[in-house]
A protein has these predicted regions:
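Gly/Ser/Thr-rich loops at beta-strand to alpha-helix junctions
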Residues: 1-8, 31-32
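Histidine-anchored nucleotide/phosphate-binding helix
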Residues: 5-19, 93
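Short helix-capping segments at alpha-helix termini
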Residues: 17-21, 45-48
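Short beta-strand element of Class I
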Residues: 24
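Conserved phosphate- and dinucleotide-binding cores of soluble alpha/beta proteins
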Residues: 27-173
Length: 173
């Protein structure tokens, strides 16, 4: 099996092969902290300048003009241009659209069995993950929590879906 970040790292490797240099602002990606534990260290090991930021900071850096492209992996891509990715992606995509920043999603390919967002069921995971960080409780046990693990990003927010074979041709619905 592979995880969504493979497509992201393929894109980084191709950019590196074409001598592209840029700084990466990488959100920590709560609650599992994949950005902090996986993405940022791997990008730094590839030689990219990286800045680890909290999940709430992308809007700040987009508004300040320090982010000029928004690029993510995707857990799922549809032929209509819909993207499914980690929770937090939707708010960043909306913010990118607001600041006229292109949003590129990397994908290993489209799921031809799903036609549109109505075919997607967003999984909710254990809400206790939101109430702790790496096993340390950060709030009272009397506080409720919700943990949808994926966002569904509308095609109107996506500039292009990039696959190893090239850009995915998005079909209008």
């Amino acid at each position: 099996t592979c995880f969504a970040e493979h497509s992201f790292f393929i894109a980084l490797a191709l950019a590196k092969a074409h001598h592209k240099a840029f700084k990466l602002y990488i959100p920590e990606t709560r609650p599992y902290l994949q950005g902090a534990h996986l993405t940022a260290p791997a990008a730094a090991e590839m030689g990219y300048e990286t800045a680890l930021i909290t999940d709430g900071m992308p809007a700040h850096f987009m508004g300040a003009g320090r982010i000029n492209k928004y690029i993510t992996a995707s857990d799922l891509a549809l032929l209509d241009g819909t993207i499914v990715n980690k929770v937090g992606t939707l708010e960043n995509a909306i913010c990118a659209k607001y600041y006229n920043i292109p949003y590129y999603a990397t994908s290993l390919g489209a799921d031809i069995n799903k036609k549109n967002r109505q075919d997607i069921v967003v999984e909710y995971r254990d809400p206790n993950w939101v109430k702790e960080i790496q096993g340390v409780k950060i709030t009272s046990s009397s506080v409720g929590a919700l943990y949808p693990c994926f966002d569904v990003i509308d095609s109107s927010l996506v500039t292009k879906i990039i696959t190893p074979e090239g850009p995915l041709c998005i079909k209008a619905q």
